[in-house]
Amino acid sequence: MNPSSLAEAFERHLKLDLMLPSAKAGDRDRFEALTAAVRDLIGERWLATDAAYDLKRPKRVYYLSMEYLLGRSLKTHLACLRIEPQVREMLERRGIDLDRLLETEPDAGLGNGGLGRLAACFLDSLATLQIPTIGYGLHYEYGMFRQEIADGWQVEHPNNWLRRPDPWEIARHKEAVEAKIHCALRFEEGGTHLSDHRVTSLRGIPYDRPVVGFGGKTVNTLRLWEATSPDYFDLNEFNHGDFFGAVHDKILAENLTRVLYPDDATSAGRHLRFLQEYFLVACSLADIIRHFRRTGGEWTSLADQVAIQLNDTHPAMAVAELMRILLDGARLGWDESWELTVRTLAYTNHTLLPEALERWPVELFELALPRQIEIIYEINRRFLAEVHARFPRDEVRIERMSLIEEQPVKAVRMTNLAIVGSHSTNGVSAIHSELLRTRTLKDFAQMLPERFHNQTNGVTPRRWLLTANPGLADLLTQAIGEGWITDLRKLRVLEPLAEDAGFRARFREVKHAAKVRFSAWLKSALGETVDPGSLFDFQVKRIHEYKRQLLNILHILILYDRLRREGAGADGPARTFFFAGKAAPAYALAKLIIKLINNVADVIDADPAVRGRLKVLFLPNYDVSLAERLLPASEVSEQISTAGYEASGTSNMKFMMNGALTVGTRDGATIEMAQEAGEENFFLFGLTAEQVLGSRGWYDPHWHYAHEPEARAALDLIAGNHFSRGEPGVFAPILDALLTHGDYYMHLADLASYTRAQTEVAELYLDQDAWTRRAVRNVVLSGKFSSDRAVTGYAEQIWGVRPCPPADADLAAGRSGESADHRMSARTGP
C-alpha cells in the first residue's frame, strides 16, 4: 500500500464510517479510521488465504483454547505488514502522533496469563509459517478483571474492553451454530444455576479476528464464540408486565461468555465454567465438521484433513463430543468413531499442580450432557479392560487410570479423558515432560509411551522483540539484517560481538534509553519516581505461592535490614524491584502477598535510611501492553518457582530476548535457557525438583528460622508488625504458611541460596562490561525459544501439516472479492 492510497483510505473511513471531518475527530476516532484502513489491506490477504485453503484443501489445524491473551493489535499488524513507517509519515503530515493513537486501543479482554499468551504466540507463528489454522475461543464481554490497588489490597473491577466495538472483529451471524444442553438455566441466589427442566438451545455467534503472519502473505482466523439465546425476546412475558422475564433466557445465555474463568468458589461459578467449556467445544466442533463436510470430506478421511489441538484440559470435552457426532450424527460404529477421534485430537498439558488437573462432577454431566457421560462411561469401560489386560491384578493402578474418580465426589478426570482420547500428549519443557512421564502421568506413559512427547514453549519475536523493543531490534538488524525476525536462531552468529567493546557500548545505550523511557512513563502514568541508574529487577507473573513472590520479598527484607544496619557504607548498586501480576479473586493468600508487597514498598519509601538505595513497586493491572513497556528496561528476570512446579514459563523467554539476566531455579524452560546460553550467564540457585520431592518427609522450616539469622530477622520484621501499617497481625496467615503449615513451597529452604545469588547479581552489576557480556549472550542465544521453532515441532511431529502459501492468483481473487468456490466451479465444471 503506497502512502497516497493509505491516506485516501484513512480519510474515507474517517468521513464515511464515522461521519466526522478531520478537524472534529479525536484520537479514538482517528484510531478507528486508521484501523479500518489497515483492515482493508488485511482483508484482501485474508480472502486470498481462505481462497488458497479452499482450493488446495490442505490439512488444517484447529486450535481450541479457553483464552487468548492478544494485547493490542494495530501496532503488531503494522509491523507484520511492514507499513509502520508509511503510516507514521502519513499521520505526521496531518499533525497526528501515531503513538497516541496506538495508546487508545484497549488490550483485548480474552485472556489472563501464560496459557492465553502462548496461544496468541502460536497463532502468530502459525500464520507466519503459513500453516492453515483456525483458532477457536470464547468472545468474552469483560474478560479477566481489571486490577486496582486500594490500601495495598487487590480490588477487582470489570474490564469493559468492548465499551466501544472492537474494529478488528467481524460478527458472522450467518455462521452461527447451536449447542444443546439437556437442562434449563435459571437465576437464583445471585448466579446462574442448572435445573432439569427442559432442553435448552444456546446460540453461538462467531466473531472473527485476523491473524496476520509476518510479511502479510498469510492471514489466518481466530474465531470466538459469543453465547446468546435463539429466542431473544418473549413478547408475551413483556405484554404481561414481566419485563425481566421477557429477556430472561437471553440474559442467562449471554452470561456464558460474560467473563473469563468465573469464580469457582460458588456452585453458580462452577456451573458457569462447566457450561463455558462445553459451549466452546460444541460450537467449535460443529463449525469444524460443517466446514469439513462442506468441502466434500468423507468421514473416513477426517483425521487426514483435520488436526484438533486441545490447549490444556478446558476443551477436553471434545473427546466425548466428537464421539457423539460420529456415533449419532455420522452413524459410524464405535471402533471407527474411536479411531477417528484419537487420530484427530492432540492434547497439551500445561501443569504439574494436582489442583489444576480438572475434574467435573458426574452429576453435572448427567444433568446437562447425559449422552456425553454415557459415551465417557463406555470409553472408560473399554479402556480399563485394556489396562486390566496389560496389568492384571493391579487394582490400584486401574483406579488411578480410570476416567471416573469415585471419591470424595464422583467426577470425570478431564486430564485422563484428554490423554485416552488423543493420539498425542505433550509437555511444554523438557523437565515438565519428564515429570509427566515419571510422576504425574506415569501410569499412562507406561501404558501408552508412544503418545507422550515434549514441545518446549516459545514466544513470538515479532511482538516481544521487534515491536516491544525497537531500539534493540534495530541494533540487531544493523548487525545481521532482518533474517532473525523469522528465524531467531540466526542471532547466534552475533555471539562474538559480546567481546566487542563498541557493540557492548551501543547495547548499554539502548538499555539505558529504555530505562529512561520506562521511568518517564512510570512518572506520568503512576506518579512514581524511580532512578533509571538503579538496577531494574522484575518479577511479573500470576501471583501464586509456587511462583514465590514471597521468596523475593523475603530477600528484599534481608536487603532492607542490611542497608539499615550498615548505613551509607553499604556496598552494592541502588536497586529497584518491580512486581506485577493478578491473584485469583478467591485466592486469599495470594491477595495477602500483594498486600505485603505494597506495604513493604510504602515502608521502604518512607524510610530515609534506605532512600536512594532501595525501592519496591507493584505495577497494577499487568497485561500485554504493560509487559511490552517494561521488557526493554529489564535487567534482572526473577524465575524463582519451586523446582518441579513450573511447567515451562514464557516470561522467562521474553526477558532473555530483551537482555535481562535470569535469577532462577532449575525449573521449567529456565533449565533449557541456561543450557543454551551457558549456566555461567545465569544466576541459578536452590533445590532441584528431585531434592524438593526427596525432602517432603523431613523438611522443617523452623530449622532455617533458628539457624539463619537473616531469615529470622526478615520474618521477625513481618511478625513484629513493621509492615502492618495499622493492621496488627494482618500478615499472620503468611507466617503460618511458612512456619506452622510446613512451608510447602520451600521458601525458607531456598532463601539462603537465593540471597547468595542476589549478592552475585549486585557484585556483577558493578562491572558493567562483564554484565553486558552476559546480557548480549542471553539475547543472541535465545533463538531456540521462538514460537516458530515450537510450532514447527507440533506441525511435523504431532499434526502432520505443511505450509500452504497463497499464490498471486489467490491474492488477485481476494482483491476482487471472487470466492474460491466460484473459481473451483469454473475450473472443474458442474
Predicted segments, located by residue:
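A conserved ligand/cofactor-binding region detector
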Residues: M1-E818, M824
